[in-house]
Amino acid sequence: MEVPEIEKQIGINLYSTDTTGLGGQLRQEIEDFIVKEITNREEGEEGKYLIVELTKRDWDTHHLTRTLSRILQVSQKRISVAGTKDKRALTTQKISIFDTDASEIEKIHLKDIELKVLGRSRKSVELGDLWGNDFRITVRNIENSPEETEALLKKTTDEILAQGGVPNFFGIQRFGSVRPVTHLVGKAIVEGNFEKAALLYIAEPFPEEPEETKNARQFVKDTLDFKEGLKTYPLRLGHERAMMNHLIANPEDYSGSFRVLPQNLYRMFVHGYQSYIYNIILCRRIEAGIPLNRAVEGDIVCFRNEVGLPDSSKTEKVTSETVNAMNRLLKLGRAFITAPLPGYNTEFASGIPGEIENGVLKELGVSLEGFNIEKFPEMSSKGTRREVLLEVKPKFEAGEDELNPGKSKAVLEFMLPKGSYATTVLREYMKVNPLQMS
């Protein structure tokens, strides 16, 4: 089945299942997307950190932590989370607040927010605490009858289970859902062209954007008149406006214009380009008929860490002598085949997997030295590897859609490790434009 054009733009050109798509739409209601964080934390009664269970509905994580810091009259730096959760969802996660009494939480009354004190700890909540997330997702407005939907759910699930999961693609969120430009900016940066990178981010219009935004971007793209452009750029485009203000004050300082952005944003550009290359390599492996759950000579595998998650820092290359033993570990779920997120110091596979990896780099004209970015060292990346198979065992049910008479709905439940995308699973069931999943 043909994939949408927007997915081809981010390096994904196939589905791993052969079934007809359900169609339908996500998030018709906020409660259609429920996420519960899984951590390895156990709280006690002592320590400087107050540990709180946060359930939020339709709140951005960063906006919420700013709001909590204002109400509690503490620095935002004293509030820690293990991971950022979807805004348009009902999500539950742990947060820690440094040097705050439990009684202070009772003073917080925010719409669509529930806070429950769990205890105290000597350690803040941090990214390393996160194992993964449990999802319960409702797909609505499906044209089929409930019986047809149930049959399709079963067929797709059977195919997913038979192949051990789904390809561990980077989803559209990694690149920008409405405006998938992140990897294009990253490519220009790796090629040393900061002017092109800045203009792509500031001024490249995309079809799904509002008309006024497209017109504003097109004007700046055509004229490079940042001063005049600022008059028409919507205030919500704060990052682009900040870059333009820098360029007005510092003409031609395109690399410097990226320094006005938050670190977590400017680091995403090179990561986005690496993710694009990874997606293409993963597609080529599938097209070559090489399994994702069985190693061949030359593959690089990684192993589980102490909490059971794939650890890309512990790798081994598969040889003719070790291939059988490695496949036993793969079958037991103790090892994982990987593909590269290339950088200036990445280990590449050999054999047929290596030919695929190096072939994609050559085809795209990628220079690994380019990932060592002298003008902006904080953007540099030595690269890493990522497991190619996302192990998932979905449970499902179908029924009448009470919000859309005459249509059916599907409910899917599954657990994913951190760093994976629910839409990577959902795309195999729905087979729709990713914008219908945002």
UniProtKB/Swiss-Prot annotation:
The EC number of this protein is 5.4.99.27
Q: Name one GO biological process term.
A: tRNA pseudouridine synthesis
Location of the TRUD domain: 165-390
Q: Which Pfam families match?
A: TruD
GO MF terms here are: RNA binding; tRNA pseudouridine(13) synthase activity
Q: What class of enzyme is it?
A: isomerase
| Keyword line | Isomerase, tRNA processing
Give the catalysed reaction(s), semicolon-separated. uridine(13) in tRNA = pseudouridine(13) in tRNA
Work out whether the entry's keyword set contains tRNA processing.
yes
PROSITE patterns in alphabetical order: TRUD, UPF0024
InterPro entries for this protein: PsdUridine_synth_cat_dom_sf, PsdUridine_synth_TruD, PsdUridine_synth_TruD_CS, PsdUridine_synth_TruD_insert, TruD_catalytic
Q: Where is the active site?
A: 86
Gene3D superfamilies, per this entry?
A: 1.10.1510.30, 3.30.70.3160, TruD, catalytic domain
Q: What does the UniProt record say this protein does? A: Could be responsible for synthesis of pseudouridine from uracil-13 in transfer RNAs.
Q: Which NCBIfam families match?
A: tRNA_TruD_broad (TIGR00094)
> Which family, according to the similarity comment?
Belongs to the pseudouridine synthase TruD family.
- Name recorded for this polypeptide: Probable tRNA pseudouridine synthase D
Upper classification of the source organism reads: Archaea, Methanobacteriati, Methanobacteriota, Stenosarchaea group, Methanomicrobia
